[in-house]
Swiss-Prot record:
SUPFAM superfamilies in the cross-refs: ADC-like
Cofactor: binding comment: Binds 1 pyruvoyl group covalently per subunit.
Record gene name: panD
Assigned GO CC terms: cytosol
Family: Belongs to the PanD family.
Catalytic reactions on record: L-aspartate + H(+) = beta-alanine + CO2
Protein name: Aspartate 1-decarboxylase
Amino acids binding substrate: 57, 73-75
Single GO term (MF): aspartate 1-decarboxylase activity
KW Cell wall biogenesis/degradation (keyword) present: no
Summary of the function given for this chain in its UniProt record: Catalyzes the pyruvoyl-dependent decarboxylation of aspartate to produce beta-alanine.
GO-annotated biological processes: alanine biosynthetic process; pantothenate biosynthetic process
Subunit structure: Heterooctamer of four alpha and four beta subunits.
Length: 128
């Protein structure tokens, strides 16, 4: 039996824009992706802290350093620019591996600048 475990999370990200005409997805700054151990085309669960809505989509790699979090296509109807969201990835693991797994958490400020990065249960790495 495999368990679905939190792999990584970008916490308190602010939606910077939306593009209803795009086919779908979420564009995320490449630096944030690297920090959170996320990659292009990876499936994500997004939670909108402003309205409680949850939706799934996939990642498009954004330009490093722009701090963009852009919702595309139908996902752009789920959160507005300025909304605070949580972006999560998950991984399947055997129970033995899952018991010792520590997801990567990246916490950002209101401008999507990384503030802290850590694995759950480890010391925070303060970034600014």
């Amino acid at each position: 039996m495999k368990l679905h475990m939190l792999k990584s999370k970008i916490h308190n990200a602010i939606v910077t824009s939306g593009d209803l005409e795009y086919e779908g997805s979420i564009t995320i700054d490449k630096e944030l992706l690297d920090m959170a151990d996320m990659i292009a085309n990876e499936k994500v669960l997004v939670v909108n802290n402003n309205n409680g809505e949850r939706f799934e989509t996939y990642i498009i790699e954004g330009t490093r350093g722009l701090r963009e979090i852009q919702l595309n296509g139908a996902a752009a109807r789920c959160a507005l620019p300025g909304d605070e969201i949580i972006i999560m990835t998950f991984a399947e693991m055997e129970p033995e591996e899952a018991r010792n797994w520590k997801p990567m958490i990246v916490i950002v400020d209101r401008m999507n600048n990384p503030k802290r990065r850590h694995r759950v249960g480890s010391e925070d790495e303060y970034l600014g």
